[in-house]
Amino acid sequence: MSVHIELPTELRPLMKRPLGTLYRGKGRDTVEKFVGELASPTKLISVGDVTTFHLLEAGIIPDICIVDNRTKRKPVSRDVSDRNRDKVYEEVSVDNPAGIITDELIKTLCEAFDSEKLLRIFVRGEEDLATLPVILMAPLGSVVLYGQPDEGVVFVRVTEEKKEEIRVLFEKLISKNQNTELDKIRRILDGHKDP
């Protein structure tokens, strides 16, 4: 049986606010606004199909990209899905239903951060909540980029302070789920390799 964390209704408004700096705009113009801020991150991670597409179109190759071939709950265009299948990436697939973070997703992310390969994680379901464990698991100095629907791209520099902010949010999610099996997820997110 899969262990998972479900996003409760009362915490959904928290997930609508940007977790970092919001760069407003659309397309490649938005990428141009923050490209100077990238400054050789430890790892560059993109979450979302449209964000990944515009990075690749601008010649910026994330170390890890997390996609589900959907945007705003609708299929992405063929151009976007084709571009996101860039040949530089090795692909890994994972099941992760909408509104949930599964232990399978977290284990896949753990393996991705341990790898030196460029990875495309294809999520069967929804990748939106992956941003939380990504920030917690990414090495310090990494940059996480994800789309804020109809607004732009959110730029998150991974610092100890940012990890602590996300850890507090994660603890709220875990406490609302009331499942002793969630200790497995907590241990992985705290850096333990044994689930």
Curated annotation (Swiss-Prot):
Query: Which Pfam families does the record cross-reference, listed alphabetically?
Result: DUF359
Reaction(s) catalysed by this chain's protein = 3'-dephospho-CoA + GTP = GDP + CoA + H(+)
Q: Which UniProt keywords apply?
A: Coenzyme A biosynthesis, GTP-binding, Kinase, Nucleotide-binding, Transferase
Top-level class of the enzyme under EC nomenclature: transferase
Disulphides:
none
Please give the PANTHER family that the UniProt record associates with this protein. Answer: GTP-DEPENDENT DEPHOSPHO-COA KINASE (PTHR40732:SF1), UPF0218 PROTEIN TK1697 (PTHR40732)
Protein's name according to its UniProt entry: GTP-dependent dephospho-CoA kinase
Organism, scientific name: Methanosarcina acetivorans (strain ATCC 35395 / DSM 2834 / JCM 12185 / C2A)
